[in-house]
Design a protein with these regions (language model features):
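Secondary-structure transition/capping motifs at alpha-helix termini
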Residues: 143-144, 184-186, 197-200, 216-219, ...
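Glycine-rich His-Gly loop
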Residues: 128, 417, 488-494, 570, ...
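Active-site-proximal cap/loop segments of hydrolase catalytic domains
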Residues: 517-719
Length: 719
């Protein structure tokens, strides 16, 4: 049962201060650096030649040449010095951090329980025990009523500074549990198998697992993706027979091209394993019967066809979302006897307005998530041509297909929220077309939805494009430029930041902030073309959109220039770097979470396993001088100038395989050496975690509280 790995947002930050509409934050009003000396990283000459150009990088040494091992003492000394400097900033802010943390904790249901789901005669759920960081998972035998705890994450996490459950699956005979876990944050999972009848942990030990795992139909074999030694890259889909050594495992698919990501899953019918190799806008799909896992894979779509697809299966047909004939995808079906492209039958044609996002097949219907002119909806389609949309009470919301492991169920479980509506779980009855509420997020310290308001506006970018902006604030927020705004953005890989709910965000709204999400190009809020218009040669549209959204908010009196704090993570951290370089005068503070700011050097470094697959997103500066010049022109790290910049908080993880630790470190070192202001610049590197920072729920809240304290201090708020 796939545990979604959440890699996004830091709920972002800010606080309250008054300014006139025309005011620009002056240097004397900024959050200042500490009296103690900030760490100064050594500059060591390093240059390389590309296409007749010389690339100088005096902080190249911050990448340990033995990576992923980091033992260079000079590097460790610098990172530890930055952490010590960060802690010196925190020392006088401990009361504020604790206040914010207690607010977060007060909104956390300490004994939260999931809505149970039924699978193969058992009812499954997870719950938290009060005070514990991790979940406990249990199941009830529906025939006997006997309850069994099968995964106690708190116990598994004992003795580890970091713990993350990757995936788990139960064998079809309900006897065996397989689960994967990561204790370093490097996303190289280990897998174990438990006999649920006896409680015995089998001798089977799998290392270097990508994360996902799934039993075949017999329950005697386990499918997983194997990471290459020393690289965060899977090239083999493996089958492990219970009782064997891992060295005996067999590869059922090998990906020869380092430029393709490899993954797998199981169809809702449980009849096929689906193997997908993907590179940017191109995917190749293969299927293997779950009853014969060593059978020759059957190709559904070749990479040469040059398009993306999502696949599920029911009643002898594959159902596929594909953007072969329209960028926003069409829905097709094809017999599993001969699933070649020529036999595909269109069920729903592609549309300029409706972007088809995901699907799940059931016995009697298909659930389909779509976005119509930027607004989400769930469609229900039966196998004889009938269809309708699920009706929700709000116009702007986030809805997705939830956990639905049973193929033969008469309802679809949906997850729902909006910027003012807490997370909810509904069961939608297909026959009666009614929603039954199964769960509403509990906020123990209290939440009154009527006290808050949300809206969507369109900001005009410099090229005339209308960019959607989702905004939430407390009622009474004055559009007279007197209150602050927190602006969040991402804008890459077609990922869309939906208008969702956040209990953390309330600590900003209750202090007078408006919180805005800029749905910039590079995401896919307005369709697949929205994504295409923010990548490769059009990448700078993403940065321009974000800055232009901020300027639109100033123009429309939501906020004064210089009273906007901004935040983004990963590729959103790249966006923050680009925004601060392009328009430093606009920002009150900048939070760059695990920021992908050293884009050019990373795309030049073929030793990094993620570099070749990423060329389809950013361009290949190794072979293409035009791509090199473009990346150099906008890469945030390359474009730091000798000028004034706003206060900044930078975060990273030593074991992060996605955005390596040296990117935030190099950014911080270079920024500190060039900026001409006296504003605060601090960096927090988690020395025992990766891309997703602290793994426990309270540890994460503490991280967020520290980040909020930085932002609140930047706005002059001390309580």
């Amino acid at each position: 049962m796939r545990t979604p790995v959440l890699w996004l947002l830091l709920a972002c930050l800010l606080s309250a201060c008054t300014h006139t509409q025309q005011s620009i934050m002056t240097d004397t009003q900024r959050l200042k650096q500490l009296d103690s000396l900030a760490p100064i990283a050594a500059q060591k000459p390093h240059s390389a030649q590309y296409h007749g150009r010389t690339l100088e990088d005096p902080y190249f040494w911050l990448k340990d040449q033995e990576y992923p091992v980091v033992n260079d003492q000079d590097i460790l000394d610098y990172l530890n010095a930055e952490n010590a400097y960060f802690n010196r900033f925190l020392d006088p802010q401990r009361d504020l951090v604790e206040t914010v943390f207690e607010e977060f904790k007060g909104r956390t249901d300490e004994e939260e329980t999931s809505v149970p789901f039924v699978s193969n005669g058992y009812e499954y759920r997870w719950h938290y025990r009060a005070g514990e960081e991790y979940r406990t998972r249990s199941r009830i035998n529906m025939a006997t009523g006997e309850e069994q705890i099968f995964l106690d994450e708190t116990t598994l996490a004992e003795g580890h500074k970091y713990f993350s459950l990757g995936d788990w699956d139960i064998s079809p005979d309900n006897r065996y549990l397989a689960y994967s876990f990561d204790t370093a944050g490097d996303e190289r999972y280990q897998a174990r198998i438990v006999d649920l009848q006896t409680g015995e942990i089998l001798s089977d030990k799998l290392d270097d697992v990508q994360g996902g795992l799934s039993f075949d139909a017999s329950g005697k074999a386990l499918v997983y993706a194997l990471l290459e030694k020393g690289k965060w890259l899977a090239k083999n889909i493996m089958v492990h027979s219970l009782g064997d050594e891992q060295s005996q495992d067999k590869s059922i698919y090998y990906e020869a091209d380092d430029g393709f990501f490899l993954g797998f899953g199981k169809t809702s019918s449980k009849q096929y394993f689906l193997i997908v190799a993907s590179q940017g806008e191109v995917q190749e799909s293969w299927v293997i019967p779950t009853k014969d896992v060593y059978a020759e894979p059957v190709q559904l779509v070749s990479r040469e066809a040059g398009f993306s697809q999502s696949v599920d299966h029911a009643h002898g047909y594959f159902y596929i979302l594909a953007n072969d004939t329209h960028k926003n995808f069409r829905l097709v079906k094809v017999s599993d006897d001969d699933p070649v492209l020529e036999n595909w039958q269109t069920m729903q044609a592609g549309s300029d307005d409706v972007y088809l996002l995901s699907l799940q097949t059931f016995d009697k219907f298909i659930a389909l998530k779509a976005r119509d002119k930027g607004l989400e909806n769930i469609q229900i389609i039966d196998y004889v041509g009938g269809e309708h949309k699920v009706q929700f009470s709000e116009d702007i919301f986030s809805a997705s297909i939830g956990v639905n492991p049973e193929f033969k169920q008469s309802f679809v479980r949906l997850d729902y929220e909006s910027m003012i509506t807490p997370e909810s779980v509904f069961d939608y009855d297909i026959a009666t077309q009614t929603l039954a509420t199964r769960k509403v997020q509990k906020i123990p310290s209290g939440y009154d939805r009527s006290e808050y308001q949300t809206e969507r506006i369109m900001a005009i970018a410099r090229d005339g494009t209308q960019v959607p902006v989702s905004i939430v604030s407390k009622k009474g927020y004055k559009k007279d430029a007197s209150q602050p705004v927190m602006l969040y953005g991402y804008g890459a890989y077609s990922a869309t930041i939906s208008p969702s709910f956040s209990t953390l965000r309330l600590s900003l709204l209750d202090r007078g902030f408006a919180y805005a999400i800029a749905h910039v190009r590079g995401g896919s809020m307005m369709g697949y073309q929205w994504y295409l218009d923010g990548k490769l040669k059009k990448r700078t549209n993403t940065f321009n959109d974000f800055v232009d959204v901020a300027r639109h908010l100033v123009k429309e009196n939501y906020v004064a220039a210089g009273n906007i704090s901004i935040s983004g993570r990963s590729a959103g951290g790249e966006l923050m770097g680009a925004a601060v370089v392009q328009a430093p005068e606009l920002w009150r503070s900048v939070t760059l979470g695990v920021p992908f700011v050293d884009v050019l050097n990373t795309m030049l470094d073929q030793s990094l396993p993620l570099t070749p697959p990423e060329w389809e997103e950013w361009g290949n500066p190794v072979t293409d001088p035009e791509a090199y010049d473009l990346l150099k022109s906008y890469a945030p790290y390359e474009n730091i100038q000798r000028t004034n910049y706003p206060p900044m908080l930078v975060t990273g993880g030593l074991n992060d395989p996605r955005v390596t630790y040296w990117e935030p470190a190099k950014w911080t070192a270079k920024m500190r050496s060039l900026k001409t202001d006296n504003n605060l610049l601090i960096m927090r590197i988690n020395m025992g975690a990766g891309h997703f920072a602290n793994s426990g729920r309270y540890g994460r809240l503490k991280d967020y509280a520290e980040e909020y304290a930085f932002v609140l201090q930047a706005h002059g708020i001390n309580e």
